[in-house]
Amino acid sequence: MQRSRWIGAGVLASALVLTSCTSGPAGVDAKQNSKAPLELWTRTTPGGPGEQGAIKLAAAFEKATGYKVKVTAIFDDFETKLQQRAAQKNLPDIVMNDVTQLGAMHSQGLLREIDLGKIKNAAQAVGQGLDSGKSVDGKQFGLPYSAQASALLIRKDWREKLKLEVPSSWDDFAAMAEAFTTKDPDGDGKKNTYGLAAPLSTKRGYASWYFSNFLWAAGGDFITETGDGTYQPAMTTEESVRAVQWFRDLGCKSKVIQPGAVTMETPPTNETFEAGRTGMFVVGPYLLPRFDETLGKDKYEVVPMPKGPKDATVLAEGGSVYLMAGSENMAGQDAFADFAISAEGQKTGMAGDTGFTVQLPVNKTVDITKVRPDPRWKTYAEIYQESGRYAPSIPNWTPVRQTTAETVNALMADCGLDTRSKLKELDKQLADILKEQGIAAS
């Protein structure tokens, strides 16, 4: 969409150099045209089921409201292309992207604040989902349209063959991982199975992303809030150190994690589970359709993560609708955000076995069992509600995730490194990151 006017030169500067602090919502007085078509970007593979789901949602929105929407799916270099459009003073009107991107986009001045008074369905949104769209200063810059949390996938046939119970503690978890590694659960007479599938690559911070399910359950943390939106590093607390050491022992001592994990992102890790090389996998619900087809629904089960030293907290994630600065159709932006979190929008996003944009509903009036009767989805929904935790909405979560991923990866790759020394180095790096973002505790 072409802009007749663009307010806020700081938006352009921040998009180019990525160093600006947050500013007020830009583009608020751009000349408005409520009939202008909306340009929507969604971070998903072009031509894939995610794009089809977004198109389906946009079509339902058009039918319900009369606003026109053009959907563009981009996966590779999404953030770079968004910055290029900012430099051209021509951002899309709406972006559907990961909830963790809020801080970065807000700090670059790319977003406008959302007035919840104009989003009537916001009152029906799940509280923690709504909170995930708030910036450090408590203002709303994103609205959730989909949620998810991690559950434990187990090769049910392996577990039953070895006469093991579903793990209820970390000790049970470790014992099952060892049994799957050493007791030939597939019965082929070869030592070719491993207990746990784990994507521990440094790329996009995968190692940190995966490990958070264990760190938080142990009572540890990457960074902790100290009040007034400030944070301090937390990887050298006793809880964090114990969590790292316990997880590290899975790879270095009992050797129950698949070989090559430290170089693997999610695609090759997914393959180890569906190919019968690993027996447990901590992951969200988005892989159920794939594993049902490739592995077989009867071969694996979905259960909550066992309780760690503190509790069973797992990573909560999801997608958010972001209203971009400089739009000439702010009424249309608001209408789309409202529709996306409405009961109708949520059910539309959940429809079908593939190509859905909504994993777990964020509208409290939507009963997942009525839309998806498969009980595994209810398990995921209960985990999200009871144990899900989002990463904090700091100005930029990416460097925290990336830096911690590099340390976790190094500790898993080199079993000779000293755990406490590496975590002490990590805390110093995290302190610098927090200081750079202006949120370090004094």
Spans of features found by a protein language model:
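Extracytoplasmic/periplasmic solute-binding protein
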Residues: 137, 141-145, 150, 174-232
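Conserved C-terminal helix/tail region of periplasmic/extracytoplasmic solute-binding proteins
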Residues: 160, 386-442
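C-terminal lobe and pocket-closing loops
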Residues: 285-297, 308-406, 441-442
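Glycine-centered hinge/linker elements that transmit conformational signals in sensory
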Residues: 177, 228-261
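Paired acidic/hydrophobic, glycine-rich loop segments that form the ligand-binding mouth/hinge
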Residues: 93-96, 279-284
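A local structural motif
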Residues: 63-73, 90-91, 139, 163-164, ...
